[in-house]
Amino acid sequence: MLNIIKNKIVAGVIASLFIVMSQSAFTFDVSGENFPANFKMTSWTAGNGKSTITSEGIVGEGYGKVYLTHNFKVSADDGMSGEFTGQARTINQDGELQYASLQGSWSREGTIVTMYSFDTLNNGVINHAQGKVDLFAGTLKFEVFEVN
């Protein structure tokens, strides 16, 4: 009888640990120094299972005027999530030009697309950007975190 109780307690503890561990495995939270990057959509081209959005905006941190192209591909059967690739070009008032490759994942709920991106710049900087695209308002609003 004592062994049965002991086994049930051990099983309960293991189940509790599994529940706690699995909950933390599905959370994604980024913290630390970041800067805002806000853009206005300039075009949206739709295709079969894909879309391309271009946008532009002024970004601090020395980037200046930034032009973005995001190529979205649907990967879920319901059409509500997928991957994207893209390019960025920046030019500041001193005429310094930078470029970056963009890649990440997206999901959509209603008019809002949530994006998680890792961006590699030509100067070696890697940024993580996370934010939201409002398809109705035509805005893109990101928080950018320098990875390295």
PLM feature segments, named:
Residues 11-21:
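Bacterial N-terminal signal peptides
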Residues 24-148:
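Beta-strand-enriched cores of mature, soluble protein domains
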Residues 2-13:
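Bacterial N-terminal signal peptides that target proteins for export
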